[in-house]
Amino acid sequence: MATKQLLRRQIKRVINALDYDIIAAESHTISQAVRSLIASANSRRVACYMSMDKGEVTTGEIIKNLFQDGQEVFLPRCTHTSESKHFKLREDHHPHLIFHRMSSLKMVRDLKPQGPYQLKEPEPHIEESDILDVVLVPGVAFDIKTGARMGHGAGYYDDFFQRYKILHEGQKPLLVGLCLMEQVASPIPLEKHDYSMDCIVCGDGSIHWFQ
């Protein structure tokens, strides 16, 4: 656990210091690769994330492309079981993600910062996701040899993947990690609740698949 926390701090220090131009260039390359990947996978229902101001792949272009290509787009909201009334996997009132369907790019652009991290999130009344084909996943670091992912430590995405499998008889969407070149790390120590990616798309445009 200490090794994982140290690695997280080291990677965060690097990516938080990156120039915006570097992140923008890599994010554009990733968006083009993701567009091709989703088209070839014949996917229709895609979950993405609203990127933070720094330290991760930006998703504005990806979301715009998804709407242009006729995908159904879903974005996450941070909530907790006492509010959502969803079943509990851990302690009472623990935090988790809900993905909501966005009907247009304008709807996305009109989102306001809210929630514990002041991210642009959907309002609670918007339609929730059921079946998802693809989830585009953020992270602090990714291992392109094994598919391992290290998040920010709160467990939101691993919790969502576990909930999804319980609700859908063991099935899960295609999990696609979006990774700046500066986020590539190996090895990444995993705990029993950590989910690995099905593929990772990197800032140089490469796509790494895992069985």
From Swiss-Prot:
This is 5-formyltetrahydrofolate cyclo-ligase. GO terms for molecular function: 5-formyltetrahydrofolate cyclo-ligase activity; ATP binding. The gene is FAU1. N-glycosylated. Present with 468 molecules/cell in log phase SD medium. Belongs to the 5-formyltetrahydrofolate cyclo-ligase family. It holds the Pfam family 5-FTHF_cyc-lig. Substrate binds at E56, H152, G153, A154, G155, Y156. InterPro entries: FTHF_cligase (IPR002698), FTHF_cligase-like_sf (IPR024185), NagB/RpiA_transferase-like (IPR037171). It is found in: Mitochondrion. GO terms for biological process: folic acid-containing compound biosynthetic process; tetrahydrofolate interconversion. PANTHER family: 5-FORMYLTETRAHYDROFOLATE CYCLO-LIGASE (PTHR23407:SF1), ATPASE INHIBITOR/5-FORMYLTETRAHYDROFOLATE CYCLO-LIGASE (PTHR23407). ATP binds at K4, Q5, L6, L7, R8, G151, H152, G153, A154, G155, Y156, Y157, D158, D194. Disruption phenotype: Abolishes methenyltetrahydrofolate synthase activity and leads to accumulation of folinic acid. Leads to a striking methionine deficiency when combined with ADE16 and ADE17, 2 isoenzymes involved in the purine synthesis. Only enzyme known to utilize 5-formyltetrahydrofolate (folinic acid) as substrate. Contributes to tetrahydrofolate metabolism in an alternative way of folate biosynthesis. May regulate carbon flow through the folate-dependent one-carbon metabolic network that supplies carbon for the biosynthesis of purines, thymidine and amino acids. GO terms for cellular component: cytoplasm; mitochondrion. It is an enzyme of class 6 (ligase). Its EC number is 6.3.3.2. It catalyses: (6S)-5-formyl-5,6,7,8-tetrahydrofolate + ATP = (6R)-5,10-methenyltetrahydrofolate + ADP + phosphate. Keywords: ATP-binding, Glycoprotein, Ligase, Mitochondrion, Nucleotide-binding.
